[in-house]
Regions:
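N-terminal export/assembly segments and adjacent metallocofactor-ligating motifs
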Residues: 1-234, 258, 263, 271-272, ...
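Acidic/polar loop patches that form or flank catalytic/metal-binding clefts of enzymes
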Residues: 27, 238-239, 275, 289-290, ...
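N-terminal leader/propeptide and maturation segments of large enzyme subunits in energy/redox metabolism
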Residues: 67-72, 234-272, 454-602, 660-662, ...
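Extended redox/cofactor-interaction regions of prokaryotic respiratory oxidoreductases
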Residues: 114-188, 193-196, 221-225, 310-419, ...
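Short beta-alpha connecting loops at secondary-structure transitions
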Residues: 207-215, 432-437, 446-457
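Catalytic, metal-anchored helix/loop core of enzyme active sites in primary metabolism
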Residues: 422
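Long, contiguous, secondary-structure-rich segments that constitute the structural scaffold
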Residues: 464-517, 521-522, 654-667, 671-763
Length: 763
């Protein structure tokens, strides 16, 4: 038996783990006290990761769809040769607009992204669709306007805040904050601190709160606007901070002062006394921060919500300070900056949608495939994603994917999307390869965890860097690795820390500019084989995939040399980044990469004047338009995608991992159930404009009347059986989304629920 250090892959926290491995199986999973961020924390979901690693639907070898619709086993050589031929032919006949990529690695599979994006370059395409773009792109767009770059990302210093305002999030189940349950417990126990939760359901986090504002679903924008109006009208805004660091407050102030405060509070259906208490406490606190999540990012007014929640900490000056909201450093670039005003980014053919942070929204993908125009999407690569179940309107995805000329899926399991593919390519799991995540969101101390492989892969499963490098070679895009670079990488003494190779590699790309887009694979084939960490166990699987991290470490050290040195790394202007890279490579528990000081947070602002630009005309218009928005209250509103104790993302396919709620019950207020003749455990039919689902009812008096909830992470077929629980996106509509970012309104889906016996038969 061996004990291996790795990390959880279920949410963006990526907590460190120690896993006992015996005979190729996980025998015990516990938190890793040596992890620089999580420090031993473990939740119940991570403790069941053996069900991800060992389940029966693992892909064993490449598959090709036959004319009869079945799959046949093929070799890697045949699969990649045929794919190379098809991709070249598609590019030559239809150009780059005919090709798109969907994926990005989920919550912990990000290292392959440097390699998969090269395929887009080879295909002359920029169309990247990602789950992030059905969750967070409205937030990224707001960041670009406020701070000057869509990559400027905000975190929250909850551990040191006197007042914590959580809006549309349930960290007790969803995590998203450091060591969530410990942090919530500490907040609750401290009488000098105040926890406020805004949520239409009395969640586990809301039960721990000092104040729970149980808003009517979809009215968060009205509540946040009311809080801001109160702060301004009572002159609680931080004039000193606004004068020193912001511009455009005058236009915002004018809008807030004329806002119909009482009407907005009534629209949210909360008590004015509670709103006043929260506004005053937040504004007057020594330190305060805001934490938000999908509850407002996938609800009505999504992009406006992202603007208003940031205004709460900006207007009060709780930004760039201990216990406030702050920027953070980053190593792995998972986002881009694609401001549509620059005029250089490609809109989609049908919706004329521009990318946000380099990403296009999944909500429009079926339409872009079915578009009758010549430049519609004809071929799609799906990597580590299952959009058939996770994208809005499953029926639309199934219909659109059936019309593709080429659908290729790279995954560890035979997903619902893979079942529709022309080729299915087996990837190694996240514990069978070198891997990492780009969700390094901490401030002032930030860390990066390069996870070492702790198990050998299945015989024909390959890591994504190898898959995409081989494909580029088969397409003729990537020449054989230059012998001189390979020799230099092998010969260069360790004391020069690869700097000679870096200089030679840069010179090679300068002379061969066509190959610059393929730098990751070139480093993989040249420097990669020479990366041999001292840790013997990891040496059995090549660390070549980590080679591009050298360039990223050098860049970070150039941008933030003092922060890198404070994190414990030693070196001069030339060697500091190489020293950081070596630490990343050698430390299986993860390593600190930067240690900032709070007053440095403002340095991340990218506007030329170094100020926060509060006036965003498009969003001020949306804010003003709330006054005239008609109040429409559906019979029932479905919250699609509730976080529960035993649901996670799509990588948990084996239903045996769940200790409770095996059917993914529909939660409903007892009075709503009684009005429909339903009791706990009854079967019912939940119907929306797009479809119907049979569900099991569970009574929950923590819900507001008029709302029901279903969990995400269900509906997968296991070992060829029926769907395990609800396929919730049979109920969601692609057009029911934010008008700016096209993020879906999953948390506000109008539905009807009826006792199954009284329902019309399903078609």
């Amino acid at each position: 038996m061996s004990t291996e250090q790795t990390a959880c892959i279920l949410c963006s926290r990526n907590c460190g783990l120690r896993i006992d491995v015996q005979d190729g199986r996980f025998t015990q999973i516990r938190g890793d006290a040596d992890h620089p961020v999580s420090k031993g924390y473990l939740c119940q979901k991570a403790a069941r990761l053996q069900h991800y690693q060992e389940h029966a639907d693992r892909l064993e070898f490449p598959l090709k769809r036959t004319p009869s619709g079945t799959f046949e086993r093929v070799s890697w050589e045949q699969a990649l040769r045929e794919l190379a031929q098809k991709l070249r032919a598609l590019r030559e006949k239809h150009g780059g607009k005919a090709f798109a990529f969907y994926g990005g690695g989920g919550q912990g599979n990000h290292l392959g992204g440097a390699y998969s994006r090269q395929l887009l370059k080879a295909m002359k395409s920029r169309f990247v669709y990602s789950a992030l773009a059905q969750e967070k792109t409205g937030d990224f767009w707001v960041n670009g306007r406020l701070f000057g770059d869509q990559r400027c990302h905000i975190t929250e210093d909850i551990e040191h805040a006197d007042v914590v305002l959580i809006i549309g999030a349930n960290p007790f189940q969803a995590h998203g904050i450091p060591n969530a349950r410990d942090t919530l417990r500490d907040l609750k126990k401290d009488p000098q601190r105040l926890l406020v939760v805004v949520d239409p359901r009395k969640t586990e986090s809301a039960r721990a709160a000092d104040v729970h504002l149980q808003v009517r679903p979809g009215t968060d924008a009205f509540l946040m606007a009311a809080l801001l109006a109160l702060i301004v009208r009572e002159n609680l805004h931080n004039r000193e901070f606004l004068a020193a660091h912001c511009s455009g407050f005058e236009a915002l102030e004018a809008e807030l002062r004329q806002l119909p405060l009482e009407t907005f509070v009534a629209r949210a259906d909360v008590q004015m006394t509670d709103v006043i208490r929260v506004a005053r406490a937040f504004a007057q606190a020594r330190s305060a921060c805001v934490r938000v999540d999908l509850g407002i990012q996938q609800s009505l007014h999504s992009t406006l919500n992202s603007y208003l929640e940031k205004l709460l900490f900006l207007v009060t000056g709780h930004f760039g300070k201990k216990g406030g909201n702050n920027f953070h450093s980053s190593l792995l670039p998972i986002l881009g900056h694609t401001d549509e005003r620059a005029g250089k980014f490609i809109p989609t053919a049908r919706h004329r949608m521009f990318p946000i942070a380099g990403l296009y929204p999944p909500n429009i993908l079926p339409d872009e495939i079915e578009n009758p125009a010549e430049d519609h999407i004809r071929a799609l690569f799906v990597d580590s994603a299952n959009p058939v179940l996770t994208g809005a309107n499953t029926d639309a995805y199934e219909r659109a994917f059936s019309q593709l000329e080429l659908l290729v899926v790279v995954d560890v399991a035979m997903t619902e999307t893979a079942n529709l593919a022309h080729y299915v390519l087996p990837a190694a799991t996240q514990f069978e390869k070198w891997e990492c995540t780009g969700f390094n969101l901490e401030f002032p101390d930030n860390a990066f965890h390069l996870r070492h492989p702790i198990l050998p892969p299945r015989p024909e499963a390959l890591p994504e860097p190898e898959i995409y490098t081989r494909l580029l070679e088969a397409m003729g895009e990537l020449p054989p690795a230059p012998a001189l670079l390979k020799q230099l990488a092998a010969w260069e003494p360790s004391r020069t820390q690869h700097l000679g190779f870096v200089a030679a590699f840069g010179a090679y790309l300068s002379m061969n500019k066509r190959l610059k887009p393929y730098a990751a694979s070139l480093m993989y084939r040249t420097l990669g084989p020479q990366l041999k960490p001292a840790r013997a166990e990891a040496d059995r699987i090549s660390a070549a995939a980590a080679a591009p991290l050298l360039g990223l470490a050098l860049e970070l050290a150039q941008r933030e040399p003092e922060a890198v040195r404070r994190a414990g790394h030693v070196g001069n202007r030339l060697t500091l980044g190489a020293s950081l890279f070596q630490a990343i490579l050698e430390r299986p528990e993860g390593t600190l990469i930067t240690r900032h000081q709070y007053e440095e947070s403002g340095r991340f602002i990218r506007h030329e004047d170094g100020r926060v630009h509060l006036e965003i005309p498009e969003l001020l218009q949306m804010l003003h338009a709330l006054q005239d928005e008609p109040e429409q209250v559906p019979s029932l509103v479905l919250l699609a995608g509730e976080r529960r104790a035993y649901n996670a993302n799509q990588i948990y396919r084996d239903p045996a991992w769940r200790r409770n709620d095996p059917e993914g019950a529909l939660r409903m207020h007892p009075e709503d159930a009684q009005a429909r003749g339903l009791i706990s455990g009854a079967r019912a039919l939940c119907t929306s404009e797009t479809g119907s689902l049979e569900v099991t009812v569970e009574l929950d008096d923590g819900l507001r009347r008029g709302m029901v909830s279903l969990p995400h992470g269900y509906g997968m077929r296991y070992q060829g059986g029926p769907p395990q629980g609800p396929q919730i996106n049979r109920l969601t509509a692609s057009h029911h989304c934010d008008p700016l970012a096209r993020t879906p309104y999953h948390k506000h889906v109008p539905v009807e629920v009826r006792a199954l016996e009284a329902a019309s038969p399903l078609s």
